[in-house]
Structures are given as C-alpha cells and as structure tokens.
Design a protein with these regions (language model features):
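Gly/Pro-enriched, hydrophobic low-complexity segments
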Residues: 92-94, 128-132, 139-141, 145-300
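N-terminal mature ectodomain segment of secretory-pathway/periplasmic proteins
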Residues: 60-159
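Compositionally biased, proline/threonine/alanine/serine-rich low-complexity intrinsically disordered stretches
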Residues: 23-59
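Exposed alpha-helical structural elements
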Residues: 42, 64, 68-71, 75, ...
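Bacterial N-terminal signal peptides that target proteins for export
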Residues: 1-10
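Bacterial N-terminal signal peptides
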Residues: 9-20
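Intrinsic-disorder-associated interaction segments
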Residues: 6, 36, 40, 55-65, ...
C-alpha cells in the first residue's frame, strides 16, 4: 500500500583480495636454497588457476517493493491526518463471493507526539448498498466504548437498532475480513508490508515471485501507478496467487487493490478473493470529534 517507482539498489560487491610475493630480501629457509627470483615468482603466479570472483547474489524481486512501501507509509504518516472517500468492495468469505458493497467512509488516522497518542484512530462507515444493508452505520473510536464497534443495523427492518459489537467477533468477520482498525491508508500499507515480508520468508530465492509495474494506469479517470505480484506456484507461507495495488499519482494513496487465489487447474481463471476501490478521496478534510460522535448513528 506513488511519487515514483523505485528501482532495485546496487547489489553488494564482493572484493577478492590476493596475496603477493616480496621479491627482495627473501631469505632461504634452508642452507643452500636460493630465494625465489622475480622471474620464478611471476611464473608461479602465471601457473595459478584463474578463479573468478564469485558473483554477488541477485536482489530479491520484492526488495525494492518493500523499500518503496516503507517510504510511502512514512510519507502518509507525516502528511495525512484524516480523509473521506467512497469504497466499493467485495470479499470471498467462507467460500462465497459477496455482492458489491458501497460505503461512504470517514477516517481519522492515529497521530503521535512521542510517546503520546495525540489523536486516536477513528472510523465511521455508512453503507449505501446493497438494499439489505442500506443505511447501516458502523462507528469505531479507539479508547471509547471499551474499544467496541457501535453498529446501526440498517436494511429493511428495524434499521434504527444500535448495538455494540466486538470488532474481532465472528459476526464482524462474516461481513468483512479487513479489520476496521486497519482501514486507514497507513494501516493498509502496514498490512501490505507484513504480507511482503512473509512472501520473502516463504520464497527467499525469489524464484516463485514475479513483479510487474505499470506506470501509466488509470483508475476512475485518475492517473495511477500499479504494482502486480504473482506467485505462479502454491507454496507454504504464500497467501495469494496474484495481488495488485494501484497508487494515485497525485495523492500518493492506494486507491485500488485486488487479490486472487490459485486456480484449481491450469485452464481455470484464478478466483477473486477480494477487491477494494477508493473514489472521491479527500485528504485532510479537518474531521472533528463531532464527525465520530455516537449521535451520528441515531440520525437519518
């Protein structure tokens, strides 16, 4: 989860140090044995095998991607305090691919003045569709309501009912596999970094990792740069067949990502596991405490 796509840095250089001969002042080790002459030393060097210096290992395909992700996360943590957007998403949960969800989202990122948290993470979601959950609202403010979600039911019946829910409960995970506590752009990149680190550990030689970059992509009319990672073969520790992320070239935030599982057979299309698209993104909208007040759930 760009200003420019980074290229892999130069690989480490290995230097082979040889030993030379001194040709003057060399004493015979035994009586009657002459010191080697310059000519004999040169001949000895010429007879040595011509062993080339070992080639440095090639960098892992994900090395520059990780570096890039760290730099982007640092940039967002320094410059983005809050944002609003609309999310269009669907996920495969318990084997079934959801219908598209359309969600308006208000997010206040966590900020620090070391070591104190000056602004806790806060999230408000309002579901626009599909109809069975239209009008649902979900509120989370770290440190309030015992760190539980406040949820207005929405939908066709008893839409006004508000309950509090554990964000790690199974009922929440049946709706979304992305924790609401990790929904901010910085947290999306943090989750991406952890996944990349796991990929490197599972494929340390990088022979099962293909990285593609598209610098001229467009998402909803906005110029983007896209990164796609593919693992052709299923392997322990790898979580996906392919995953893509698009970064808005002007805003430097991820505006789309999708993940695919491995196909069951080579002639099948890989099954979609999840996709998220962010539109109408406004950064630093100066969201205040009233935006994340519980009273928002009781309104129309």
């Amino acid at each position: 989860m760009f200003r420019r796509w980074l290229r892999p840095g130069a690989a480490f250089l290995l230097t082979l140090l040889g030993t030379g001969f001194r040709h003057q002042g060399v004493q015979a080790q035994h009586a009657g044995t002459a010191a080697p002459t310059l000519a004999s030393a040169t001949l000895t060097e010429a007879l040595r095998p011509n062993v080339a210096a070992p080639r440095p290992p090639a960098p892992h395909p994900l090395e520059w991607v990780l570096k890039f992700a760290y730099e982007e996360q640092t940039y967002l943590q320094r410059t983005v305090r809050d944002f609003t957007c609309r999310v269009t998403k669907r996920e495969r949960i318990e084997g079934e691919l959801q219908d598209y969800r359309y969600i308006d989202m208000w997010v206040r990122e966590q900020t620090h003045a070391n070591p104190r948290v000056t602004q806790p993470p806060s999230v408000l979601l309002e579901f626009l569709g599909p109809s069975e959950i239209e009008g649902r609202k979900v509120l989370f403010v770290a440190g309030q309501n015992d760190d539980r979600l406040l949820v207005r039911k929405g939908g066709r019946r008893f839409s006004y009912v508000v309950t509090d829910v554990d964000p790690a409960s199974s009922i929440v995970k049946r709706e979304s596999l992305m924790p609401i506590t990790e929904i901010g752009f910085s947290q999306v990149l943090d989750r991406t970094i952890r996944t990349l680190q796991q990929d490197v550990a599972a494929d340390p030689r990088g022979d099962n990792t293909i990285v593609e970059q598209i610098t001229t992509a467009t998402i909803n009319g906005r110029p983007c740069q896209m990164l796609r990672i593919t693992h052709p073969r299923r392997r322990d520790g790898l979580q996906f067949f392919s995953a893509s992320m698009a970064i808005d070239s002007a805003l430097h935030v991820p505006v789309r990502f999708d993940v695919y599982d491995w196909p069951e057979t080579p002639d099948q299309q890989p099954p979609l596991m999840s996709e998220f698209t962010y539109t109408n993104v406004t950064l630093n909208a100066e969201l205040d405490d009233a935006t994340f007040a519980a009273a928002r759930l009781r309104g129309p």
